[in-house]
Amino acid sequence: MSTETVDLRYPIGNYESQPYSEKQKREWLNDLKYFPQLIENAVLNLNEGQLNTPYRSGGWTVHQLVHHVADSHMNAYMRFKLGLTEDNPTIKPYEEKLWAEMADTKNLPINISLTLLHALHARMYEIVSNISEKEFERTVVHPEHGRTMSLWFLLGMYAWHGKHHVAHITSLRERNNW
């Protein structure tokens, strides 16, 4: 795999968890809170041809990315709720590549997922912003990754995930002068 491909896949680098701090918590919470507006701005004024352009060779189209983030963050919302209400629950993985090929992703306009993201992130922010430092230590089990993850880890991962996909779109726009 070439360096260019790696950079295009991970334009902001890989996710790296950070130790708990109030400063980091505020930063990640702001990432969650403002993500819907960031992705909406990233796709603003793109035409159908641009929306159907893969962000890299072999990658998803912008259209698929927007729907993927909605799918992923719906799962995140449920994972936080499960982690807060159950003792170390095993979360349900999903086949994101297959989900990206389903009828809703292929046929519905992105404004459906953009609207969903605004509502979803308002709810997720309300839950996560009220988690105590002790509650952030609660865990979920991800069977596909074979590991136990704290809610703190999940907060950082989903804050990163949103920025990661916004960067896919904005870097594509920059490369193509859109």
Label every model-predicted segment.
Residues R26, N30-K33, H63, H67, ...:
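A generic "alpha-helical surface" signal
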Residues E22, W28-L29, S113-L114, H164, ...:
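Short leucine-rich amphipathic alpha-helices used at interfaces
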Residues L29, K33, N45, R56-H63, ...:
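Alpha-helix initiation and capping sites
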Residues M1-E16, N52-K97, Y125, E137-W178:
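Short, contiguous alpha-helical
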Residues Y20, W99-I112, E144-F153:
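Acidic/His metal-coordination segments adjacent to aromatic residues that form catalytic metal sites
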Residues A42, L46-G49, D87, I131-K134, ...:
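A short secondary-structure junction motif
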Residues Y20-R56:
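Short, contiguous, helix-prone interaction/anchoring segments in small proteins
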Residues N30-A42, A100-E137:
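Acidic/histidine-rich alpha-helical segments that form the ligand environment
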